Design a protein with these regions (language model features):
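N-terminal glycine-/charge-rich "phosphate-binding" loop or analogous flexible N-terminal tail
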Residues: 1-45
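Phosphate-coordination loops involved in phosphoryl transfer and adenosine-cofactor binding
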Residues: 2, 86, 134-138
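Short, well-ordered beta-strand segments
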Residues: 4-7, 67, 90, 139
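Short coil/turn segments
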Residues: 8-12, 70-71, 93-95, 143
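Alpha-helix capping/helix-boundary segments
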Residues: 12-13, 53-56, 146
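Loop/helix-junction capping segments adjacent to catalytic residues or to phosphate/diphosphate-binding pockets
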Residues: 14, 39, 98-99, 148
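Phosphate/diphosphate ligand-binding glycine-rich loop within oxidoreductases
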Residues: 44-121, 131
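Rossmann-like dinucleotide/phosphate-binding beta-alpha-beta segment
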Residues: 128-148
Length: 148
């Protein structure tokens, strides 16, 4: 039994199709940076990674699963035909928690050291004082799992 997945993403790593084939023997995996280029292949695809625009979805005869390439799937991601279909949509909820949290702390430290002032200068001159972090309070506001 073959399984076809289309990777609809500019960020898709060129090594992913081979990794998918190794993990799922007989799988067919193809990368499309522009979903419009996948019009012929979507008709036989079982799954898609990324965003499947309505005009592409309309041609998807066998599609059973869409794995969104992001965590927050707002209303713009869904459209009537997708909502009314039996296609399962999964997201990356929780996948980026550690990465996002680490990134947020890195920016916090960069701003505390006033990197936004020094970086454009491309040289280090005494400028605005640094924020001394011990004793400071940080409030992290987030509605998703990365902000918890």
């Amino acid at each position: 039994m073959s399984f076809t997945i289309l990777l609809l993403s500019l960020e898709a790593d060129p090594s992913w199709p081979e990794k998918i084939r190794q993990a799922v023997p007989g799988a067919i995996a193809k990368i499309f940076a522009d979903p419009k280029d996948a019009l012929a292949d979507i008709e036989t695809a079982d799954a898609a990674y990324g965003t499947v625009p309505p005009e592409l979805f309309a041609r998807a005869k066998k599609l059973r699963w869409i794995c969104a390439s992001r965590a927050g799937l707002g209303g713009a991601y869904f459209y009537d035909a997708l909502v009314k279909s039996d296609v399962v949509v999964t997201g990356m909820h929780g996948s980026y928690n550690e990465h996002l949290s680490t990134h947020a702390v890195a920016f916090l430290l960069a701003f505390a050291r006033r990197f936004e002032h020094y970086l454009p200068q491309k040289r280090w001159e005494r400028g605005p004082g640094m924020i001394h972090l011990p004793g400071q309070t940080v409030l992290i506001v987030g509605v998703g799992s990365a902000g918890q």
